[in-house]
Amino acid sequence: MEKKTITVLMVEPHRHPYLKTVEHTLESLQAMVGGYITATYPWEDPVALVADDDGLYKQDYEWNRYIDDYHFIRGNFFICGLGREDFCDIPAELARKYAEMLWMPESFIKVGGGLMVIREDDGSKPYV
């Protein structure tokens, strides 16, 4: 029996996003984010942002990306497509769109009671 795979846009702290293909199993998806998964849907496109369920609260996870006022993500996360009942491959055009949006890694500095985001522009361009 052929194993099913899923291709996602992987986003790690201090790295550019990249496409990654893994087995389409709960265990493989959990391994990519380092724990139990949770999905959020911050955009109108048919994609999910999948992260560690506890990632926002674990102090030992590095800050990764600022998505919007409600989504400061810690640790690894990935973006995948949405199928009828499950996650699916991220479509190529959406992989390009979100690779461009999240291309620059970010650093976070605590300032007063909040966080300041510094984008790490190395001059490279998305290749997804």
What residue spans do the PLM features occupy?
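Domain-length accessory/inserted modules outside core catalytic folds
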Residues: 2-128
